[in-house]
Every structure is written in C-alpha cells, then in structure tokens.
C-alpha cells in the first residue's frame, strides 16, 4: 500500500505541490529469493504484477477519485522495467504520461548484485555487517 506523505507548508515547496507519494516496485523473483538486485533489470513476478494492480487501484482511489480537483499529476519512475511496470499500472488507465528518470534508479551494489543476502553475510561478514 502506498504511503501518503503530505507536505507541510514550506517556502521551499512550490504552492502547487499537494502531495508526493513514493511507491516501491512490485516483487521480483530476486526479491522472493532474497537476492540483492540493485540495477539488474529483473521483471516483476506474478505476485509483483498482482501487487502493482492493487497499488494502482489504491492510488486511483486516493489521488483521483477523492481529489478530482487536482489538475496536474506527474508520474516519475526509474528506467528499470520493474519500476516502469509499477508506474504504468497506475498511469496508463488514467492517460497519464510516465517519465522514466535514471536519477531515481536503484543504487548499484556492484559485485554484490544477484547474490543471495545470506551468502553475502557469509562471504563478506565484516562488510555485510557495516552495510546491513
């Protein structure tokens, strides 16, 4: 379920910004296997596809059905497929354009990407402890 973060009135925030909602992508096979995926472009699995449909319904209800007076809605996502699929599940039925942006991409974990977290803890115990 998306977390709604309402912005307090702040001179640094433009008047027209009503809310910013951050939504994590749906589950992937790597998530289910507890593998560190980082910037490897792993697609959503069946559970992840179901999750994004449910999240899209909740977002539509929260931000469109209950607040039809807000004219501008902007959907920004990572350029990775799992994030784009999540964004499109909400945006496409509403005719909203999705703006992929590499600046919101998952961070890189370098050589750790694709390795199960449990294996990382065993192979690199000191590094893993400082990271986790």
Listing of model-derived features with the role each one plays in the protein:
Residues 20-25, 111:
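Short, positively charged
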Residues 93-132:
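Phosphate-handling substructures
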Residues 12-15, 67, 99:
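Structural motif
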Residues 19-22, 32, 130:
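Residue-level recognition of specific faces of alpha-helices
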Residues 21, 76, 99-101:
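General small-molecule cofactor/ligand-binding pocket signal
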Residues 2-16:
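Non-catalytic terminal regions with compositionally biased, polar/charged low complexity
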Residues 14-21, 73-74:
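Extreme N-terminal starter segment of soluble prokaryotic enzymes
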Residues 2-5, 24, 29-94, 123:
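Active-site-proximal alpha-helix that buttresses catalytic centers in soluble enzyme cores
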């Amino acid at each position: 379920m998306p977390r709604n973060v309402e912005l307090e009135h702040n001179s640094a925030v433009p008047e027209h910004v009503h809310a910013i909602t951050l939504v994590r992508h749906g589950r992937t096979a790597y998530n289910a296997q507890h593998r560190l995926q980082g910037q490897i472009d792993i697609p959503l699995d069946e559970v992840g596809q179901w999750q994004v449909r449910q999240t899209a319904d909740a977002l539509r209800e929260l931000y469109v059905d209950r607040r039809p007076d807000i004219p501008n809605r902007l959907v920004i996502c990572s350029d990775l497929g799992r994030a784009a699929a999540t964004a499109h599940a909400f945006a496409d039925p509403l005719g909203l354009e999705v703006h992929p942006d590499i600046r919101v991409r998952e961070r890189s974990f370098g050589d750790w990407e694709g390795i199960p977290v449990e294996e990382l803890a065993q192979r690199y115990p000191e590094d893993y402890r400082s990271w986790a």
